[in-house]
């Protein structure tokens, strides 16, 4: 029975919706012996390192990945060990609360570069025996939480892969439907000596030219792997131009119990040279640097002012409760003592009772409603907030509050303050939802001013333009049904834009900061329009991703090039006339995403001893951290 495209899509859906406790869905089998899956080519390890996979010219963006349905003994052992360790971590996390100090230290450990290169790389050379011993004794190794997400592959022996490839060349139409038979095929293989072929590829281009390919693992970076690269490139023919790429991880996407949706910052550099290939070649000043910023959701590593972000998410929670009253307000885990808050409110009323002590004489001053917000937001429940509001409103009733509020302050509390000065004041009835709404309104007013001032002062962006953008976004959202309070939601894109621009600010040379205002406008436009468009479809915008490309000349190299590139590649193409004959790519990776490749290379990689005197590793030792691979695609001309 031939394999149909619907079978492959059904399997992918079953995997996507599989629960943690559910059994793995039954694989789609070829000849009752090989697993077949449909995978986007951009997700294939090593091959996805191409600067542009569409340049390969394949007739489909999805390929068939064929491997064994049975995991190797080594993979089963590793999976069992990591599951055991994960269970221990879960039990431990339930017993202990993670403090902010630990979270800060963890962030530094992830992103601060040490003399050994920073990050979790030092742990990638642990043997399985040592890892198993560590798991049994429950000893934590620094950096072990930075686990690599391996691509699911169960390779078959290289000899079997060659036989299968030959069989499919002749018999694929008998085993695949017409739609599946057209797709390119990638066979996962393994050898025990270098160079070891990990991918065998075959297919056709969109011009119906036959393509065959292979990815070889050459070992760790040393003289031998350099010689192999040279020999393989010479076999491909002379290339006129070398196209280089280096990918730097500035902030890594690492989830923690307090950071469930982490963000990341990546700098992807590309440049061309006509000189001979040099592994780990440094970029020239003409290199293009693509800055990719993904803020994640609630990732405090991007917070310029943590109190602003903390209060923003709190106000969003208040708006959510107003829209869904069955939900509860989530107050701070460490709230102040209520007696202290009562005393703070008493002191505020006293300060506001003097006519010569009037807050908010200009837009950047703190209003009395801001003062009230900074007290009530520290409560532990809605009842406490209600009592504090009543104390303040009682003072309004007796005309004790002499302070004024700005004309643009549209909160209900601001209108009550104005009414108290015209003898038109009536004490409102404070119930659960009315208290929450009053809190939300003064929180919005406080945050709006702070965000605009912070954005303007830190990044030198016109405050009146920010005010206009914010108001436009709020008006657009207010016309849509089913959205949360537009005054609250409109603060999100502005705040996220501030975090994004602050990241770019750190990468620019001082003399090139003139480009920042235009970049800020692009970010603001992208985030605000994205939020409005999603709101029109009834969706909530939680994806804040921005990319921009700048020449290396504008970049502050010290801000990111003190790190080592996680991925380094060199691509070259050999042509005969107008036709491409071969495409070759040399790749150096610090963290290959194929587990069997890591295991094979690590078995031969020299283990760098940890010296008590903190000796700096040599360049040769640091280079040995890289795994070297070489991919060749051959295009067979039509006869």
UniProtKB/Swiss-Prot annotation:
Record keywords, A-Z: Cell cycle, Cell division, Centromere, Chromosome, Cytoplasm, Cytoskeleton, Developmental protein, Kinetochore, Meiosis, Mitosis
Annotated stretches, region: Disordered: 76-116
GO BP field: cell division; meiotic cell cycle; mitotic spindle assembly checkpoint signaling; positive regulation of mitotic spindle pole body separation; positive regulation of protein localization to kinetochore; protein localization to kinetochore; protein localization to kinetochore involved in kinetochore assembly
Cellular compartments per GO CC: cell cortex; RZZ complex; spindle
Acidic residues compositional bias, start-end: 96-105
Basic and acidic residues compositional bias, start-end: 76-95
One Pfam assignment: Zwilch
Coiled-coil ranges per UniProt: none
Keyword Glycosyltransferase: no
Entry superkingdom: Eukaryota
Subcellular location(s) per record: Cytoplasm, Cell cortex; Chromosome, Centromere, Kinetochore; Cytoplasm, Cytoskeleton, Spindle
Disulphide bonds in the chain: none
Chief place of localization: cytoplasm
Family (UniProt): Belongs to the ZWILCH family.
Function noted in UniProt: Essential component of the mitotic checkpoint, which prevents cells from prematurely exiting mitosis. Required for chromosome segregation, the assembly of the dynein-dynactin and mdf-1-mdf-2 complexes onto kinetochores and spindle pole separation. Its function related to the spindle assembly machinery and kinetochore-microtubule attachments likely depends on its association in the mitotic RZZ complex. The RZZ complex recruits the spindly-like protein spdl-1 to kinetochores.
Complexes and interactors: Component of the RZZ complex composed of rod-1, czw-1 and zwl-1. Interacts with the spindly-like protein spdl-1. Interacts with NDC80 complex component ndc-80.
Protein name: Protein zwilch homolog
Annotated organism of origin: Caenorhabditis briggsae
């Amino acid at each position: 029975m031939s394999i149909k495209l619907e079978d492959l899509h059904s399997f992918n859906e079953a995997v996507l919706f599989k629960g943690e406790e559910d059994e793995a869905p039954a694989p789609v089998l070829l000849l009752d012996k090989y697993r077949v899956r449909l995978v986007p080519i951009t997700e294939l390890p090593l091959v996805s390192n191409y600067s542009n996979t569409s340049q390969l010219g394949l007739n489909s963006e999805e390929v068939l990945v064929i491997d064994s349905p049975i995991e190797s003994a080594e993979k089963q052992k590793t999976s069992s060990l990591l599951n055991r360790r994960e269970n221990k971590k879960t039990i431990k996390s339930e017993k202990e609360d993670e403090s902010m100090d630990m979270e800060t230290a963890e962030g530094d450990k992830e992103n601060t570069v040490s003399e050994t290169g920073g990050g979790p790389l030092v742990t990638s050379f642990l043997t399985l025996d040592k890892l198993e011993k560590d798991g049994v004794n429950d000893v934590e190794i620094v950096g072990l939480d930075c686990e690599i997400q391996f691509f699911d592959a169960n390779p078959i022996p290289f000899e079997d892969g060659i036989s299968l490839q030959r069989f499919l060349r002749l018999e694929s139409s008998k085993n695949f439907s017409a739609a599946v038979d057209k797709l390119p095929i990638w066979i996962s293989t393994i050898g025990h000596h270098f160079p070891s072929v990990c991918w065998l590829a075959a297919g056709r281009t969109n011009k119906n030219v036959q393509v065959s390919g292979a990815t070889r693992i050459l070992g760790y970076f040393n003289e031998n792997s350099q010689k192999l690269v040279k020999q393989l490139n010479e076999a491909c023919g002379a290339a006129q131009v070398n196209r280089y790429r280096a990918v730097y991880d500035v902030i890594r996407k690492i989830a923690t119990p307090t950071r469930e949706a982490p963000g990341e910052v990546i700098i992807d550099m590309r440049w061309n040279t006509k000189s001979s290939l040099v592994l780990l070649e440094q970029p020239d000043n003409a290199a293009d640097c693509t800055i990719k910023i993904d803020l994640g959701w609630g990732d405090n590593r991007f917070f310029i002012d943590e109190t602003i972000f903390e209060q923003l998410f709190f106000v969003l929670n208040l708006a959510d409760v107003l829209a869904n009253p069955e939900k509860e307000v989530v107050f701070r885990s460490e709230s102040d003592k209520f007696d202290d808050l009562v005393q703070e409110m008493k002191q505020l009323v006293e300060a506001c009772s003097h006519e010569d002590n009037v807050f908010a004489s200009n837009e950047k001053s703190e209003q009395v409603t801001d003062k009230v917000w900074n007290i009530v937001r520290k409560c532990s429940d809605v009842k406490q907030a209600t009592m504090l509001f009543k104390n303040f409103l009682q003072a309004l009733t007796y005309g004790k509050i002499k302070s004024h509020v700005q004309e643009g302050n549209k909160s209900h509390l601001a209108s009550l303050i104005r009414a108290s000065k015209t003898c038109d004041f009536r004490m409102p009835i404070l119930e659960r939802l009315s208290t929450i709404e009053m809190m939300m309104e003064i929180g919005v007013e406080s945050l709006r001013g702070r965000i605009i001032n912070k954005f303007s002062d830190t990044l030198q962006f016109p405050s009146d333009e920010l005010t206009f953008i914010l108001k436009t976004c709020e008006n657009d959202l207010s016309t849509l049904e089913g959205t949360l309070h537009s005054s609250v939601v409109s603060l999100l894109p502005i705040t996220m834009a501030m975090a994004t621009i602050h990241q770019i600010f750190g990468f620019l040379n001082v003399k090139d900061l003139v480009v920042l205002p235009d970049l800020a406008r692009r970010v603001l436009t992208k985030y605000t329009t994205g939020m409005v468009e999603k709101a029109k479809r009834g969706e909530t915008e939680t994806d804040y991703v921005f990319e921009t490309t700048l020449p290396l000349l504008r970049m502050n190299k010290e801000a990111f090039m003190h790190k080592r590139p996680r991925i380094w590649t060199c691509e070259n193409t050999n042509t005969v006339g107008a036709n491409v004959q071969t495409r070759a790519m040399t790749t150096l990776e610090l963290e290959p995403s194929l587990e069997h490749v890591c295991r094979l290379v690590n078995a031969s990689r020299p283990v760098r001893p940890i010296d008590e005197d903190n000796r700096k590793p040599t360049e040769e030792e640091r280079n040995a951290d890289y795994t070297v691979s070489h991919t060749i695609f051959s295009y067979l001309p039509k006869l």
